[in-house]
């Protein structure tokens, strides 16, 4: 499947996406890449046009079938896929709720800078945040200043991070501008 996500955004967001990319990469043409027509290459727009209006019923075993394949460096530092079943993900969500009994369903504001393709970002942050109805403040390219600004602007109550980032935040010149007591 070959696609360009900006083509599917509503008007203003489509324009801003193209404008922002242009500032980063210079004068580039954004659109469908020139991919040779082959039997195994499909344009996303064509697949959408062919999609049925209702989807067929699918049977699966939640304890066996894979729901997601996030990546982690684990203890070795080498990236590896973690095969999560539907059951694993629900168990993680239930464990997340039990681990943080002080969180109020639908009331927390989470700074979500961790990548969702990584197991920590996908399961702990995204899955638990969304299933509990929390607000996730997303970053496409997180930076220390942006994280600190967002923590105050959105009145963050939850911040999941990694030790390296905690060090950067601790030593940052603007860290005293954040109400850290609000975090749970």
Predicted regions and their residues:
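ANL superfamily adenylate-forming
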Residues: 1-63, 172-173
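Proline-centered helix-kink/hinge sites
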Residues: 79-81, 115, 144, 163
